[in-house]
A protein has these predicted regions:
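Intrinsically disordered, low-complexity regulatory segments
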Residues: 1-150, 220-221, 229, 236, ...
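Conserved short loop/turn motifs at secondary-structure junctions
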Residues: 2, 82-84, 169-173, 254-263, ...
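Alpha-helical scaffold elements adjacent to nucleotide-binding pockets in ATP/GTP-utilizing enzyme cores
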Residues: 16-20, 66, 89-97, 127-134, ...
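Metal- or metallocofactor-binding catalytic centers and their adjacent structured scaffolds
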Residues: 228-263, 460
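Short acidic, hydrophobic short linear motifs in intrinsically disordered regions
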Residues: 252, 261-274, 301-309, 476-488
Length: 875
């Protein structure tokens, strides 16, 4: 019997939706995007109106083949990726691959069976079933907006990154939004470095009234005019003038102040509060929210989507959800906390789709306490945050009684020194009973001036207990943390909240910034971050301009609304980009060849030192060094690092000079492959080093995937060789997920070839049956037979001259004694013979590799021209 084929992005989402749709549908997962611009090559024809060359993403061929197979027997195809630009693009690519032919997939007239788009903002039975009653066509304005963003990012990534490779260092990347975000951090650091602190003083008077409590009032002016205390001399003069002064209440102002609840979460507000309140990175918070949206097992209820879609700019709330939350407030908190009408909020974002809702619980009746047993710790924290914010948004305002008291101290010659104190008392909790929005430190500056006050009246005399002068210094603007960076990006209109997690991860992973340890860790630009930012901003002024980047974001919104053509937006961008790119190619400084004169002398020969650039940053070298002259001076030394660049890194217990614990010589800061560290100046005689824990270790991220060995959840972890996936049950369970490339081992025939990382950081390929099978290859094996020596496989080697297929039996770089050894047949023990006989049937189906003397085959074939594979950022 034919069924409807439903395609979503993830297996977790598929599992939840399958339960709601029943046996009449097959729900399958595409595992995210199935098509993209080619990994190598630009993939965009800028001369032909930005025509694109999309291809199936390598590794997704089996997924696409399986979906095609299922589509052939389905009576209808329902495309149900997420309700946003990315989801619409996934749906469009699925439609193209599953048989829609006319207009590049933009209509389905030649498709014999209906191909329909289905969207829902929450994964609940009611929402899903209702969505399937009202399917629609693909929204090509949304697809065009996504494609425009993708092309913009590809153009910048592929054409600017090579400039950095050529002028600074290979492996660096530039991104249309990534670089602008980095610019914010770098410019803030420059602002901090330029900041000159200014001295100022405060003066508080501790006073008694007829009744307690004692309170403090602060000096604000003289004879009714505002005045500041600039130094200690002025402070002491005021203290002398106030000796014997009469203290009187000049005025008392009382007012009732209301504090309104905040709207339910948008994506950016959620990211900020998760960072401030929960100490979560933006990336982690979004991953946890994704799991809550796609579905969590709730015992007998089965899999349930607990929150609405978490990528939204809207604060709208549906009528059913409003009815439900008002019912809960009246029942659990009382009618006094329930407004007569629902609170209505206006969306600030210009292009927020009102079809979307704010982030809220799918059912507010599922309280955090009721679901706590089924959630992981971070899931519960995020769910509770969203639940509390939503409930509070529909409650009454909090009410405060605020009293402001002006006090005069009448001194000699009737000079009146003015003091002020503000008292604030919570009269009615309102929404604060459930939730209070987190604030930046600067938002709380005035809180210290609010006190509980005794009964006071104008004309009342007061008694002075003491005067408390205190010295202060103005402070520079604070460095960005994740929450404040997200806030700044949103306020400037740079990027979209859904991309902020990727942007932040990229600038950290590329080594452009470091993040100090602990909750609310601050971003500090590294030396390479400063260099890259200054080069790009100086030479590509338009492209990495704040206003231009924000304007391009507005253009993308207009493409989505159908107000402008996507190609027009690209032409506007590319006109400026092409000019800037040409200018940068001619005028960008080549840091690799930099030799800046300094006033320092060589410690070996006395010649002047010059500042040069190496793979680990800048360093000093003797100006007489000559590569061609083996007798020239080779003296070099580290460029001392400004300690402020390391922020909160612990240099030593008192930030004074540190000495080696082994030899007593001074320790200095150095840079290496893995970052900044302390090293003894007695090197090479003394090799003492000490790590700096200035960078926060990335937290383990739970994945929606089970361990095949023990059934526990898998975790995305970070080790010394990069990210890897392993079991959360470690050390009891030592399962590590291997990176299969989809090829059987050509040596043993039973194992799979996996990509591995060596201690030195380079990749190689080996059999996953190691140590039973010791097959390895220095380059990626390909399931092709060598036409010359009939080797069972070839290898794909990428060089600066292009991509080549080479025979493993040819003498190639990286294949020395070890490579020869791997080709030798192993000696058979009795146990191995026995094992082999048991697997004979399985092995017969796999052709045995043809083993010939290494170096005896010369087969090589060029299959691709050299391409710059820039490390672009999807912004």
């Amino acid at each position: 019997m034919a069924k409807g084929l439903v395609i979503v992005e993830s297996p977790a989402k598929a599992k939840t939706i399958q339960k709601y749709l029943g046996a009449g549908y097959d729900v399958e997962a595409s595992l995210g995007h199935i098509k993209d611009l080619p990994k190598r090559g630009l993939g965009v024809d800028v001369e032909n109106d930005f025509a694109t060359e999309y291809e199936v993403i390598p590794g997704k061929e089996k997924v696409v083949a399986q979906l095609r197979k299922l589509a052939r027997t389905a009576d209808a195809i329902y495309l149900a990726p997420d309700p946003d630009r990315e989801g619409e693009a996934i749906a469009a690519h699925l439609a193209e691959e599953l048989g829609s032919e006319s207009d590049g997939g933009r209509s389905h007239k030649k498709q014999k069976k209906p191909v329909l788009r289905v969207t829902f903002n929450e994964i609940t039975k009611k929402a899903v079933q209702e969505a399937f009653k009202h399917p629609r066509e693909i929204d090509w304005n949304l697809v065009d907006a996504q494609q425009t963003r993708r092309i913009l990012d590809r153009l910048v990534g592929f054409q600017v990154s090579p400039l950095l490779w050529d002028k600074v260092r290979r492996g660096l990347s530039a991104g249309r939004v990534q670089t602008v975000a980095l610019r914010l951090i770098v410019e803030r650091e420059r602002e901090i470095q330029r900041f000159e602190k200014r001295e100022y003083w405060t003066l508080d008077a501790r006073l008694h009234a007829a009744k307690p409590p004692v309170f403090d009032a602060r000096f604000v002016g003289l004879n009714g005019e505002k005045r500041e205390i600039n130094n200690e001399e002025e402070s002491q003069q005021i203290l002398r003038d106030l000796a014997g002064a009469a203290w009187t209440v000049a005025a008392v102002k009382k007012a009732e102040r209301k504090r309104n609840p905040t709207p339910p979460f948008t994506t950016s507000k959620f990211q900020q509060d998760a960072s401030r309140k929960l100490g979560m990175s933006v990336k982690r918070a979004m991953m946890v929210a994704q799991r809550l949206y796609e579905g969590v097992e709730l015992g007998t209820e089965g899999t349930v989507g607990l929150i609405t879609y978490m990528r939204t700019d809207s604060v709208r709330v549906g009528a059913d959800a409003l009815t439900e939350v008002r019912e809960l407030i009246g029942r659990d908190y009382g009618s006094g906390f329930l407004p007569s009408e629902p609170n209505v909020y206006k969306t600030k974002a210009q292009n927020a789709q009102e079809a979307h809702e704010a982030i809220r619980p799918s059912s507010v009746l599922r309280t955090p306490e009721q679901v706590a047993h089924y959630l992981q710790d971070d899931e519960l924290k995020v769910y509770k945050l969203i639940w509390q914010r939503f409930v509070a948004s529909q409650m009454m305002p909090a009410v405060f009684d605020q009293t402001t008291v002006d006090i005069d101290a009448t001194a000699k010659a009737n000079a009146k020194y003015n003091f002020r104190v503000t008292g604030s008392v919570l009269k009615f909790e309102g929404f604060l009973k459930v939730y209070e929005e987190s604030k930046d430190a600067k938002d709380d500056e005035d809180e210290s001036l609010k006190h509980k006050l005794p009964p006071l009246e104008a004309g009342q005399s007061l008694k002075l207990e003491e005067l408390k002068p205190e010295q202060h210094f103005t402070e520079p603007p604070p460095r960005f943390n994740e929450a404040s960076l997200v806030k700044e990006l949103e306020e400037r209109g740079i990027g979209r909240p859904s991309t902020y997690a990727a942007i932040i991860s990229t600038i950290v992973d590329r080594g452009y910034v470091q993040k100090t340890a602990g909750r609310g860790g601050k971003f500090h630009p590294t030396e390479i971050g400063f260099v890259v930012t200054e080069l790009l901003v100086e030479n590509l002024k338009d492209i990495f301009d704040f206003e231009f980047t924000a304007r391009m974001e507005e253009d993308l919104d207009q493409v989505e609304e159908g107000k402008i053509k996507w190609t027009d937006a690209l032409h506007e961008f590319y006109g400026k980009f092409e000019q800037d790119l040409e200018y940068a190619g001619k005028h960008m400084e080549n840091i690799k060849r930099m030799e800046k004169a300094t006033d320092q002398k060589c410690e070996r020969c006395g010649s002047p030192l010059v500042l040069k650039w190496g793979k680990h940053g800048s360093f000093f070298a003797c100006s007489t060094f000559d590569k061609k002259d083996p007798n020239s001076c080779t003296f070099t030394k580290e460029n001392p690092i400004n300690l402020t660049d390391l922020g909160d890194a612990e240099i030593s217990s008192n930030n004074e000079e540190e000495f080696c614990e082994n030899c007593g010589k001074p320790m200095v800061l150095k840079r290496g492959r893995f970052g900044t560290f302390m090293a003894c100046t007695g090197y090479p005689e003394c090799k003492t080093t000490r790590r700096l824990d200035s960078v926060q270790k990335k937290p383990d991220v739970p994945l929606d995937e089970k361990c095949p060995d023990c059934g526990r959840n898998l975790l995305l972890r970070n080790g010394r060789f990069g990210e890897f996936v392993s079991c959360s049950g470690y050390p009891e369970c030592k399962y590590i997920k291997q990176n299969l490339i989809g090829l059987k081992c050509p040596k043993c025939g039973t194992g799979e070839i996996v990509e591995k990382k060596a201690r030195r950081g380079n990749f190689f390929y080996g059999c996953n049956q190691y140590p039973k099978c010791d097959f390895t290859a220095p380059f990626k094996p390909v399931a092709l037979t060598c036409p010359e020596c009939e080797s069972a496989y070839l290898m794909e080697k990428v060089t600066k001259d292009g991509t080549f297929l080479i025979c493993p039996n040819s003498r190639t770089p990286g294949r020395g004694k070890k490579a020869k050894a791997e080709e030798k047949p192993a000696k058979k023990t009795a146990a191995k013979k026995s094992a082999k006989s048991k697997k004979a049937a399985a092995v017969e189906a796999v052709p045995a590799p043809v083993l010939v003397e290494p170096g005896s085959c010369s087969y090589t074939k060029k299959i691709a021209e050299p391409q710059v594979e820039a490390a672009e950022t999807v912004a």
